[in-house]
Amino acid sequence: MQYQEVAGGICAPKGFAAAGVHCGIRANHAEKYDLALIKADVRCAAAGVYTTNKVCGAPIKVDRAHLKDGYAQAIIVNSGNANTCAANGVALAEECCELVGKELGIDPQDVLPASTGVIGQPMVIDPFARGIPAAAAKLAADEQGSADAATAIMTTDTHKKEYAIQFELGGKVCTVGAIGKGSGMIAPNMATMLAFYTTDAAVSPILLEKALKTVVPGTYNQMSVDLDTSTNDTLIIMASGLAGNPEICEENADYHAFVAALTAIAEHMCAEHAGDGEGATHLITCEVTHAPDLKTARAVSRSVVCSNLFKAAVFGRDANWGRILCAIGYTPGDFSIDKVCVRLSSKAGEVYVCENAAYHPYSEEEAAKVLAEHDILVKVDMGTGDASAKAWGCDLTYDYVKINGDYRT
């Protein structure tokens, strides 16, 4: 299937506008945008997936309640305070939805809140009461609207994350756009981040949720920065249906094409998140091939990108492939490592470092050149089957400790 990258992020699909403003949630950041608003022209099919952490943010509880009917029309997101472990958290999130509903003239039940920031801090409605009218007045269905919203949800991110692609369904051009944040507290099992997707494809709520839950295990659940599962991780998608394609109401060819498009944009966003890990200097992608089954392929690739020893080796540009084999070896499951081969690759070239679970002669000098690049691909061929999977992570640096040591200051 062919995809065309387009500008505009979440505003690229038909029927969506967005804005980002400063409302004062972060008292020590006088100018930083900290409130994002996303609005659809029509009531949309919608779906969400959330953190697996038992301690979850108040907005997630509200989202689950508001999405029971499978529809939404707006998303309100703040950065700087997680609204987690706060006595009034749910009531405050509901009040935010009321404010958005009033400003936009929509049902508050069709508003989905999200928060990111420091856990366990008091939170008041005043900044939202100021910021929501300002955001509503600033809504724009263009590149700037998406960019402002993407900026407003950032915390320790070093740059905004947005992407959009076009593809064809039922003879109609459809678009999917995304913004996301997250560079720390990122670990497999929907941990890490906030991500908001919009599409103008016509998809029923049931099939939209199924598509999202089909895509997440092989993308967002395959990403890790630090093995910390956040309390607020949220991925929400809204589908306006304004592209005019026949509505996807069954698992037909159009459904599978839609899932493929969602997978493509999710993989891109995962690489963006992992490559911008706190203090990171390298994006690490592990691609496992010829595994005995999908479960093993996913588990092995996750083990490699989660290995602190290997992450530290990449930071030091050290082709210590033994740490890769070690990570593969402690991966749960019943599989053979006897035929495992490993290559390290980047735009500077490729080195073959391990063959049949043993040393393969290579140049340390060439390996260091490969590992000097930002994007590193670890190719693991298990030689025992046909399954494959990817996982995304980053190196472990001194700055990761610095950033998290200073997080609340």
Cite the ranges covered by each PLM segment.
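A structural signal for small-residue-enriched, beta-sheet-centric alpha/beta enzyme cores
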Residues: 1-91, 95, 101-409
